């Protein structure tokens, strides 16, 4: 029997016939974890339009579920990840973290980057498994290697995070965090561009480089990162009036209360 046939046979046994709706009043744990991870469609397009909109607007979630099952059984690895993702966070129907882990691992082993990322989320949050930053880091690396640049931001955050509870072994590594943010920035990940620019501009954990810091911050701001526009406005407020006004007003358009406060202060100054 081929590997594809084995997967089809296993899937047919794993997937339940019907889904169970989420409770009318979801508990604290559901509210805490709903929304973690990401579907394949969002991961590939970089936009929220896709499966999440389809689920949010669905009149019959059972029909959506059957369609995802049909596509997964036909060999669509993205649909397999999507099923695992939904059962992982339990936002659209009652979660099943054990089933989610099985489905995500099956999709990941077939090369799906989003599935590797979602496995990382499962181990980071401890959903149906022991919390393990080491496992989360490994899965995030697999996701990045398969093209998911967002995983670089997750790795950067992970290496800056101290373990506050439990007995797992994890070492904060600020230089490693910076290197992951830099890898993500070089691949176009917008938040990573901000993180790199901020560190270079302020000499945070790395040698200060104003020119390089401004370069990355401007790239981030140009793609909608409000904090980057704020940083640029603050930086130029003391040395370049024209660029200060430009970034201040752009930050305001992005919804920045800080930039709006700066404008109000400018207006009342003599």
Residue ranges and their predicted role:
Residues 69-71, 105-107, 142-143, 182-184, ...:
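Canonical positions in the second alpha-helix
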Residues 43-92:
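Alpha-helical segment of the N-proximal tetratricopeptide repeat
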Residues 74-76, 89-91, 109-112, 125-127, ...:
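Short helix-capping/linker turns of helical repeat alpha-solenoids
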Residues 50-53, 82-89, 118-125, 154-165, ...:
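Hydrophobic face of amphipathic alpha-helices that form TPR/SEL1-like repeat modules
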Residues 234-270:
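Terminal, low-structured helical/coil segments at or just beyond the last alpha-helical repeat
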Residues 1-50, 57-60:
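Long, contiguous interaction/recruitment modules in multidomain scaffold/adaptor proteins
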């Amino acid at each position: 029997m081929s590997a594809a046939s084995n997967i089809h046979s296993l899937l047919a046994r794993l997937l339940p016939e019907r889904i169970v709706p989420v409770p009318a009043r979801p508990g604290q744990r559901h509210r805490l974890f709903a929304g973690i991870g990401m579907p394949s469609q969002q991961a590939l397009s970089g936009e929220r339009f896709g499966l999440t909109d389809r689920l949010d607007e669905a009149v019959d979630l059972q029909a959506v579920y059957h369609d995802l099952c049909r596509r997964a059984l036909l060999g669509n690895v993205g649909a397999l990840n999507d099923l695992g993702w939904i059962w992982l966070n339990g936002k659209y129907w009652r979660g099943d973290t054990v089933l989610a882990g099985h489905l995500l691992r099956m999709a990941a082993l077939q090369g799906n980057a989003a599935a590797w990322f979602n496995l990382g989320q499962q181990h980071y949050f401890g959903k149906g498994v022991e919390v393990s930053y080491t496992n989360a880091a490994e899965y995030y690396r697999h996701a990045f290697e398969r093209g998911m640049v967002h995983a670089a931001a997750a790795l950067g955050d992970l290496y800056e995070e101290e373990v506050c509870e439990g007995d797992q072994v994890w070492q904060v590594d600020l230089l490693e965090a910076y290197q992951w943010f830099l890898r993500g920035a070089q691949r176009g990940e917008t938040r990573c561009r901000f993180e790199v620019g901020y560190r270079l501009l302020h000499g945070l954990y790395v040698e200060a480089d104003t020119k390089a810091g401004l370069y990355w911050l401007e790239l981030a701001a140009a793609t909608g990162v409000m904090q980057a526009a704020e940083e640029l406005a603050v930086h130029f407020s003391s040395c370049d009036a024209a660029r200060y006004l430009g970034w201040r007003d752009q930050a305001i358009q992005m919804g920045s209360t800080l930039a709006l406060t700066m404008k109000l202060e400018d207006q009342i100054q003599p």
